[in-house]
């Protein structure tokens, strides 16, 4: 596993080192559904060459109550103004995990 994948896994599991955003479609769900979806995202570990061709663990989908949910990690500078110059360097990178319905992509 590469450095970016390790950093992405740690962030996804702990939410440390960045921000988590829920889109309007996810935010409109019940508290129970949101908690279940967040738990599924944090515990996802089924990365394969088919769904993670670059090996960075930065995007995946899950199914929840007949909804396809996407989870996507993007890389920003420490002020969240620009794209990070080096996502493998946590000293200059903040991560943003967006959890969204597939229809919101």
Where are these regions (language model features)?
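Short, compact, well-ordered microdomains
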Residues: 59-105
